[in-house]
UniProtKB/Swiss-Prot annotation:
Pathway this chain belongs to: Purine metabolism; IMP biosynthesis via de novo pathway; 5-amino-1-(5-phospho-D-ribosyl)imidazole-4-carboxamide from 5-amino-1-(5-phospho-D-ribosyl)imidazole-4-carboxylate: step 1/2
Listed HAMAP family: SAICAR_synth (MF_00137)
GO biological process terms on file: 'de novo' IMP biosynthetic process
Similarity comment text for this entry: Belongs to the SAICAR synthetase family.
UniProt name for this protein: Phosphoribosylaminoimidazole-succinocarboxamide synthase
Transmembrane segments: none
Pfam family, one: SAICAR_synt
Catalyses which reaction(s): 5-amino-1-(5-phospho-D-ribosyl)imidazole-4-carboxylate + L-aspartate + ATP = (2S)-2-[5-amino-1-(5-phospho-beta-D-ribosyl)imidazole-4-carboxamido]succinate + ADP + phosphate + 2 H(+)
Organism for this UniProt entry: Geotalea uraniireducens (strain Rf4) (Geobacter uraniireducens)
One annotated GO molecular function: ATP binding
Keywords per UniProt: ATP-binding, Ligase, Nucleotide-binding, Purine biosynthesis
InterPro entries, alphabetized: SAICAR_synt/ADE2_N, SAICAR_synth
NCBIfam families linked to this entry: PRK13961.1 (NF010568), purC (TIGR00081)
Length: 296
């Protein structure tokens, strides 16, 4: 197991932002995205990290970005440290396997969620209103049911420590413009359907996932991460049983543990037992191995 990376400190590089999981450095023409082993749940960053999580997320993102190049270009320039600018080389031991050199795109203001199954906040909305983000769904669906067709349900992009909010497609049109909103919706559904079929052949159900897009040199590209256990719900196909929550290869395991505690879901986070940290790490690594055939 490699050394835990909870935060990065590269004095020679300009830190542009620290997100819940990623540290982003501005290299002038490009960005360096370093995926740490931090983990958040309910928008609160835990004190403990998950070993090799940054590696898993980076490798899964790179796998999916490659698979989707026939649908949309992505922001990756390279995931090989040897290709990074000279000033990054001295940090190679930290960067190896968990970092990407990427194009500097202008992010769209909405997050793009696609749901193929009814779960999570979508299930809660459906129980209350019979619809999700203004999309009416058939009556009588059970929790975790497969939807007749995948649905596109955008959300706002929340500031660190606050919650994203589901919005209607019409609201996204107001935020991004009609042409971009429609293009993004169509591409999101196309990516999801392709990924769903690939994952299905590897024993994984992608219940839902979230994408981010940006504009680079006038062109729409996909940015951030791509169908990782942080941005998606991955369920094991062999134990899928609608009618309740599903076991998963993602941080749902951690969320489920936190739900058993007397914790109000605001910072500071409660300490995590070693077993929860270990099992969460195993679930992330299992997702990587199942999808790509390679671990670490």
């Amino acid at each position: 197991m490699s050394k835990l990376v909870l935060t990065t400190d590269f004095p020679d590089l300009k830190l542009a932002a620290r997100g819940k999981v990623r540290d982003i450095y501005d290299l002038g023409e490009t960005l360096l995205i370093v995926t740490t082993d931090r983990i958040s749940a309910f928008d609160v960053i835990m004190n403990e990290g998950i070993p090799d999580k940054g590696y898993v997320l980076t490798q899964i993102s790179a796998f999916w970005f490659r698979q989707m190049e026939d649908i949309i270009p992505n922001h990756i320039i390279s995931t090989e440290v040897k290709d990074f600018p000279a000033e990054c080389q001295k940090y190679a031991d930290v960067l190896e396997g968990r970092s990407m050199l990427v194009k500097k795109a202008k992010p769209l203001p909405a997050e793009c969620i696609v749901r193929g199954y009814i779960s999570g906040s979508g299930w809660k909305d459906y129980q209350a209103t019979g619809s999700v983000c203004g999309i009416t769904l058939p009556a009588g669906l059970k929790e975790s049911d497969r939807l007749p067709e995948p649905i596109f349900t955008p959300s706002t992009k929340a500031e660190l420590g606050t919650h994203d909010e589901n919005i209607s497609f019409e609201k996204m049109v107001d935020m991004c413009g009609k042409d971009i909103a429609e293009k993004v919706r169509d591409i999101t559904l196309k990516i999801y359907k392709k990924a769903r079929d690939i994952a299905d052949g590897k024993g994984i159900i992608i219940a839902d996932t979230k994408f981010e897009y940006g504009i680079y040199e006038g062109e729409l590209i996909i940015i951030d991460e791509c169908m990782t256990p942080d941005s998606s719900r991955f369920w094991p196909k062999d134990s899928y049983q609608p009618g309740g929550p599903q076991p998963s290869f993602d941080k749902q395991f951690l969320r489920d543990y936190l739900e058993t505690l007397d914790w109000d879901k605001t910072a500071p986070a409660p300490p995590l037992p070693e077993e929860i940290v270990r099992k969460t790490g195993e679930k992330y690594m299992e997702a990587l191995v199942k999808l790509t055939g390679k671990g670490k």
